[in-house]
Amino acid sequence: MDRNPSPPPPGRDKEEEEEVAGGDCIGSTVYSKHWLFGVLSGLIQIVSPENTKSSSDDEEQLTELDEEMENEICRVWDMSMDEDVALFLQEFNAPDIFMGVLAKSKCPRLREICVGILGNMACFQEICVSISSDKNLGQVLLHCLYDSDPPTLLETSRLLLTCLSQAEVASVWVERIQEHPAIYDSICFIMSSSTNVDLLVKVGEVVDKLFDLDEKLMLEWVRNGAAQPLDQPQEESEEQPVFRLVPCILEAAKQVRSENPEWLDVYMHILQLLTTVDDGIQAIVHCPDTGKDIWNLLFDLVCHEFCQSDDPPIILQEQKTVLASVFSVLSAIYASQTEQEYLKIEKVDLPLIDSLIRVLQNMEQCQKKPENSAESNTEETKRTDLTQDDFHLKILKDILCEFLSNIFQALTKETVAQGVKEGQLSKQKCSSAFQNLLPFYSPVVEDFIKILREVDKALADDLEKNFPSLKVQT
């Protein structure tokens, strides 16, 4: 499809073309005001009272968009990415026209395009503030989240994310969403049933942004699915509450993973945000099946998907944020619910140790600075990039080390012996682990050395030679 909008239709004489060049252009663009007026007028006609009171015979026409009108309004959609055009649409009260279309039209394609144009316009701060301050428009847009048309839902989610990302108006939208409990149900339904990965990712970004902006809203949504049998007093109930939000997040994550695991970042971060509050952790681990499924998904990601032994170390730069979220959630589940069957030490500890150490080793490679760089970036740009990389890698390292220390504390003599035999606790890997755990986790490493000495005294002695501080303290 041609994404570059065309000027007004041909057929004008030279005098008319000069008029367009002289005063009919929108801002500094070549787009015609007169042509745009015509398209918007056509939109008004579509939703005018005489057209909306059609008989049942015309129902099909109401849900289909005329090809010529679709082409023209799509050009406006393209054009609205230009700030001059967006401002002109704002001055012409185009948002009110689009609101009328959304309130009255049953045509999915037309609704999608109108929300898409508003989404483009909202990318500019002044217009975003204006759109957000219109209560009626806000209500109509939120109502679009109840739509059954995936493209319309996608554009609505994109618009919401744009507004939520503007600090000046974000709180307005959070408050509106809190006032509409049905939005929670709609979003849960999308996450649990949609196979449209683009939509799932965008809805996930909206949820992630909402939770990041407002912990109260996150807690409300987490608690929203807690169901208690009406005929059973809560204090006598042995049934665990059913949390709807977490299973829906899990279903969305599975669907996204099936198409592209690299897009999982947003759903992993949502789970990470949930683990920052006690109710969020409980929502994960106190639903046995869901907790097990989440653990299995994340366990499989770190053991068989991300940052594998045959991947180049530099892959860590692409995967550092998703790995931080995944390991953070695994660590929270591991620390809070160790009695669960799926967390039995002999089943998970050695594969996790192997994955944790592998990521730490790749991190060491990534942080090695090349002596001579052929890149032409300025020193200031390089310094900024390295600072950002170091920041994210430091967050990841802190998460890895805390998780690794918790696993080390739970190791038994039998598990250590198995790890030495199978290679997860080789001299090289233990050295990498110690190098990262010391000095902050010295007591944990010292206790591990004591167990290791019972299993393989020579290996324990070699490690103590490489880390003299351990020998002094033991």
Swiss-Prot record:
Highly expressed in testis and ovary, and to a lesser extent in the lung, spleen and the heart (at protein level). InterPro entries: ARM-like, ARM-type_fold, Synovial_Prolif_Regulator. It comes from the Eukaryota. Disulfide bonds: none annotated. One of its GO terms (biological process) is positive regulation of synoviocyte proliferation. GO terms for cellular component: nucleoplasm; nucleus. The modification Phosphoserine is found at S6. It is found in: Nucleus. Plays a role in promoting the proliferation of synovial fibroblasts in response to pro-inflammatory stimuli. Belongs to the SAAL1 family. This is Protein SAAL1.
